[in-house]
A protein has these predicted regions:
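Sec-dependent N-terminal signal peptides
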Residues: 3-15, 19
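Catalytic-domain carbohydrate-binding cleft regions of carbohydrate-active enzymes
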Residues: 20-318
Length: 318
């Protein structure tokens, strides 16, 4: 009889552990100047959304892309316009050119958001911007203040599938308060302290595919609502990243970041993370010498634009 009780308790324990619900944030990232195959991509996205009503995506597409989409594939554009404000879609990075924010000035970052938001809202007037999330490490320590000024409520510091460009330090649990240098805080999903780099890899963390090992580490770390993510390159002809229906990996539920933070996560935290530039472990991929030079030239150019604007204002006032 004792053996039976032990067996039943063991089964109950493991059933309880593995019944913990996993979540996954899917989406696309790219743009007209990088990888967005205009001739077929938008039609493919709307078809996939219609085919998989339980699928959710976050969009990180360079805003100017929609100018070309509207001209070259107008029917697909109009269909996506109808879906853009549905619960299946969230726009998470409206910056004009998806900059690696750590190498440009705060004024340049503000312009990236200002121009990008205006362009997206020109195409999709009903879209709002609540969560900042990116596929590549487009982070800098001053973002909380800038995000709050543009009406964002939440941020995400994960970039599990593009760590060759860099990644944030692993810290905390389900949620943290990301505190900027000026003291502004924004509720954030971090790269968990238990979210490791994949074995033998410097370009992925374990959160990229909701693997058994990742979910187990989350459970052991006390994370009640584990979530992974991958914003697929827009050039890939692939729908739901983890599969669909009964074939979805580890029974993960697709969700947008806004829905996850507001309706699934613990919702708040007392864990204040004073995030600095040193917590962004970055690298210039695809040839560091060439890209280092490009980054320097970008910074010089953007600084000159700001200087020219200031001189123009001073001349006008005189």
């Amino acid at each position: 009889m004792n053996k039976i009780y032990i067996i039943l308790l063991t089964v109950f324990f493991y059933a309880n552990v593995y019944s913990q619900q996993a979540y996954f944030v899917d989406g696309y990232h790219g743009g007209i100047y990088g990888h967005y195959p205009v001739k077929w991509k938008t039609q493919f996205v709307v078809d996939q959304l219609a085919m998989h009503p339980d699928w959710r995506i976050c969009m990180e597409i360079e805003p100017e892309t929609w100018d070309t989409v509207r001209v070259q594939t107008p029917e697909a554009y109009l269909r996506f316009k109808e879906m853009a404000t549905s619960n299946q879609v969230e726009f998470t990075n409206p910056t004009y050119a998806q900059p690696y924010c750590y190498n440009i000035s705060g004024e340049s970052i503000i312009r990236q958001f200002q121009y990008g938001i205006a362009k997206i809202n020109k195409h999709f007037p009903g879209v709002d911007f609540v969560t900042y999330s990116v596929e590549e490490p487009c982070f800098t320590s001053c973002l909380p203040q800038i995000l709050k000024q543009f009406g964002f409520k939440y941020a995400v510091l994960k970039c599990p599938n593009t760590c060759w460009g860099g990644y944030t330090a692993a810290y905390g649990g389900e949620l943290v308060n990301w505190v900027g240098p000026d003291g502004t805080a924004i509720l954030t999903v971090p790269r968990y302290a238990c979210e490791k780099l994949e074995p033998g890899s410097t370009w992925q963390t374990t959160a990229w595919g909701n693997s058994d090992a990742y979910l187990k580490d989350c459970r052991n770390a006390g994370i009640k609502h584990p979530v992974g993510m991958c914003f697929q390159d827009a050039g890939w002809k692939n729908g739901p990243w983890l599969g669909s229906g009964k074939n979805t990996k580890n029974n993960s539920i697709y969700i947008t970041w806004r829905d996850y933070i507001e309706n699934v996560s613990i919702g708040k935290t007392d864990d204040n993370w004073y995030f600095s530039q040193e917590d962004i472990h970055v690298n210039l991929m695809w040839g560091s010498q060439v890209l280092q030079k490009i980054a320097q030239e970008v910074r010089v150019s953007e600084n000159r634009i700001v200087m020219a604007e200031k001189m123009s204002v001073m001349a006008y006032l005189e």
